[in-house]
UniProtKB/Swiss-Prot annotation:
<keyword id="KW-0547">Nucleotide-binding</keyword>
<dbReference type="InterPro" id="IPR009080">
    <property type="entry name" value="tRNAsynth_Ia_anticodon-bd"/>
</dbReference>
<keyword id="KW-0963">Cytoplasm</keyword>
<dbReference type="GO" id="GO:0005524">
    <property type="term" value="F:ATP binding"/>
</dbReference>
<comment type="subunit">
    <text>Monomer.</text>
</comment>
<dbReference type="InterPro" id="IPR036695">
    <property type="entry name" value="Arg-tRNA-synth_N_sf"/>
</dbReference>
<dbReference type="Pfam" id="PF00750">
    <property type="entry name" value="tRNA-synt_1d"/>
</dbReference>
<dbReference type="InterPro" id="IPR001278">
    <property type="entry name" value="Arg-tRNA-ligase"/>
</dbReference>
<dbReference type="InterPro" id="IPR001412">
    <property type="entry name" value="aa-tRNA-synth_I_CS"/>
</dbReference>
<protein>
    <recommendedName>
        <fullName>Arginine--tRNA ligase</fullName>
        <ecNumber>6.1.1.19</ecNumber>
    </recommendedName>
</protein>
<dbReference type="Pfam" id="PF03485">
    <property type="entry name" value="Arg_tRNA_synt_N"/>
</dbReference>
<keyword id="KW-0648">Protein biosynthesis</keyword>
<keyword id="KW-0436">Ligase</keyword>
<dbReference type="Pfam" id="PF05746">
    <property type="entry name" value="DALR_1"/>
</dbReference>
<dbReference type="InterPro" id="IPR005148">
    <property type="entry name" value="Arg-tRNA-synth_N"/>
</dbReference>
<dbReference type="InterPro" id="IPR035684">
    <property type="entry name" value="ArgRS_core"/>
</dbReference>
<dbReference type="InterPro" id="IPR008909">
    <property type="entry name" value="DALR_anticod-bd"/>
</dbReference>
Length: 577
């Protein structure tokens, strides 16, 4: 259930009954401190200002109309007109029971939408590197959350699979008599790419041949298309290994590369001209946007077709947005692309809106993210200053986790240790990123991410096993106490129960904002509250069987919430560490 939504509705009704306009905002928030209750309604001040009333006077009138019977056992006015709401222990107990009776832990489903999520987007003929990590795992956490809430999610892996580089690659492969690209490892292709680029830059005849190959490829010549497909297939089969290691949900079926939109580009340029949005300028086709100014203060020109007839990324992105609305029937489109692309996307979308390709009712959202930095505060590189390959990073994560878990579990079997190392190592890399606000740069630090203290994957995974250990120690099957009542008598029980029941609110924020760090913060807080509850409220040695069973049910809901929450982040758990 969503307590915040329930209280917002109740406070809104009371505000309207007290004379507020129908569109008033109750501004119900989770309280930052225990002494302010479980929730605060902060909307009274803004409404009082509109009505020309003293805020406390309006707050008193709101309280006289506010019906929270069976929800709150105490409501008070604080400061200039805040309303503090303390949830009734009986309400908490009842909803903990309800959550345990539901596979979804009581989480309701909103009205389902079709949501396209654009993420990962590696390039063909190159290995994935750390620059692809953030888009891949943040996007996947968003996808998992939206799917859990019941939306139809279309994963769109916008692979860089088109452009002049393919003429260059095919020409060089041909030169080396390596046409059978299907037998090559991707690492070889990287070497080929470097050599091809070198030839392209230094040998004009080679460059001319490469350019002619691009024309033939774009013209649909079967030989060149076959070579191109081989390059794409090798790349994506290698990338799939990385996706599987990262425990992300992308598959080959989710590839929607740049090439998909090629057939649309001539029509889009012609249409933008016909609508008077695009004009000829110095031989190129340009859209001038009043919303963006150049250095001279004039409308900025966005090129959509070059003088030589070639198209640009902007043209592809216009076609892409149009396709996602018209063909995929998206109600909402999320782009997990780094912050440096923001202006480029905004310009493309401005053209999309002006041309009427996507209505304003369909949000196009740039869920941008910052860079991954080394401890020196500079972009994360190898010691030699090169780009860190994602496969190498995951290998190192596994190796470090192996040493860590072997040290802590000398008696564990080799197979169990290997699985634990995988869960901890990959989880640590992902969680370190997901737990930071995506809009900021973050420092990659092995020691911090593999620590068993603080807001880290190992700590959260251990917290989960610690809750489960209560049931192992007691030798209790969770089904044995399913009918036992939950009784909330202690403050720590109430605090834990209230936080457990805020799971749906947390999911809603992640779904709306694309901010998985909010889920990480929630789970970390939950683990801390359980720790305090465990220390101060004896479970197995409780004074009565009723109290024992009630506390076991709180522990059970904690375990289930931690596991499900981590699952929405793509973080695996184990039952023993």
């Amino acid at each position: 259930m969503n307590i915040q939504a329930l209280l917002s509705e109740k406070v809104s009704q009371a505000l309207i009954a007290a004379g507020a306009p129908a569109d008033c905002e109750p501004q119900v928030r989770q309280s930052a401190k225990v002494q302010f209750g479980d929730y605060q309604a902060n909307g009274v001040m803004a409404v009082a200002k509109k009505l020309g009333m003293a805020p406390r006077q309006l707050a008193e009138q709101v309280l006289s109309h506010l019906d929270l019977n069976g929800i709150a056992n105490k409501v008070e006015i604080a400061g200039p007109g805040f309303i503090n709401i303390f949830l009734d222990p009986a309400f908490l107990a009842d909803n903990v029971n309800r959550a345990l009776q539901s596979e979804r832990l009581g989480v309701t489903k909103p009205q389902a939408q079709t949501i396209v999520v654009d993420y990962s987007a590696p390039n063909v003929a190159k290995e994935m590197h750390v620059g692809h990590l953030r888009s891949t795992i943040i996007g996947d956490a968003s996808v998992r959350t939206l799917e859990f809430l019941g939306h139809k999610v279309i994963r769109a892996n916008h692979v860089g699979d088109w452009g002049t580089q393919f003429g260059m690659l095919i020409a060089y492969l041909e030169k080396q008599q390596q046409e059978n690209a299907g037998e090559m490892a991707l690492a070889d292709l990287e070497g080929f790419y470097r050599e091809a680029k070198k030839h392209y830059d230094e040998d004009e005849a080679f460059a001319e041949r490469a350019r002619s190959y691009v024309v033939k490829l774009q013209g649909g010549d079967e030989y060149f298309l076959q070579m191109w497909r081989k390059l794409v297939d090798i790349t994506m089969s290698q990338n799939q290994i990385t996706y599987d290691r990262l425990n992300v949900t992308l598959t080959r079926d989710d590839v929607m590369g740049e090439s998909l939109y090629n057939p649309m580009l001539p029509g889009i340029v012609a249409d933008l001209k016909a609508k008077g949005l695009a004009v000829e300028s110095e031989g190129a086709t340009v859209v001038f946007l009043d919303e963006y100014k150049n250095k001279e203060g004039e409308p900025m020109g966005v090129i959509i077709q070059k003088k030589d007839g070639g198209y640009l990324y902007t043209t592809t992105d216009i076609a892409c947005a149009k396709y996602r609305y018209e063909t995929l029937h998206a109600d909402r489109v999320l782009y997990y692309i780094d912050s440096r692309q923001h202006q480029h996307l905004m310009q493309a979308w401005t053209i999309v809106r002006k041309a009427g390709y996507v209505p304003d009712s369909v949000p196009l959202e740039h869920h941008m993210f910052g860079m991954m930095l080394g401890k020196d505060g500079k972009p994360f590189k190898t010691r030699a200053g090169g780009t860190v390959k994602l496969a190498d990073l995951l290998d190192e994560a596994l190796e470090r986790a192996r040493r860590l878990v072997a040290e802590k579990n000398p008696d564990m079997s080799a197979d169990e240790l290997e699985n634990l190392a995988k869960v901890v190592g990959i989880g640590a890399v992902k969680y370190a990123d997901l737990s930071k606000n995506r809009t900021t740069d973050y420092v990659f630090d092995w020691d911090n991410m593999l620590a068993f203290e603080g807001n880290t994957a190992p700590y959260m995974q251990y917290a989960y096993t610690r809750v489960l250990s209560v049931f192992r120690k007691a030798g209790i099957d969770e089904n044995a106490m399913i009918d036992a009542p939950v009784v909330i008598a202690e403050d720590r029980e109430a605090q834990l129960a209230a936080r457990l029941l805020q799971f749906e609110e947390t999911l809603s924020v992640v779904a709306r904002e694309g901010t998985p760090h909010v889920m990480c913060a929630y789970l970390y807080d939950l683990a801390g509250l359980f720790s305090g509850f465990y220390e101060h409220c004896p479970i197995l040695s409780a004074e009565s069987e009723e109290t024992r069973n009630s506390r076991l049910k709180l522990a059970l809901l904690t375990a289930k919430t931690l596991k499900l929450g981590l699952d929405t982040l793509g973080i695996e758990t184990v039952e023993r560490m």
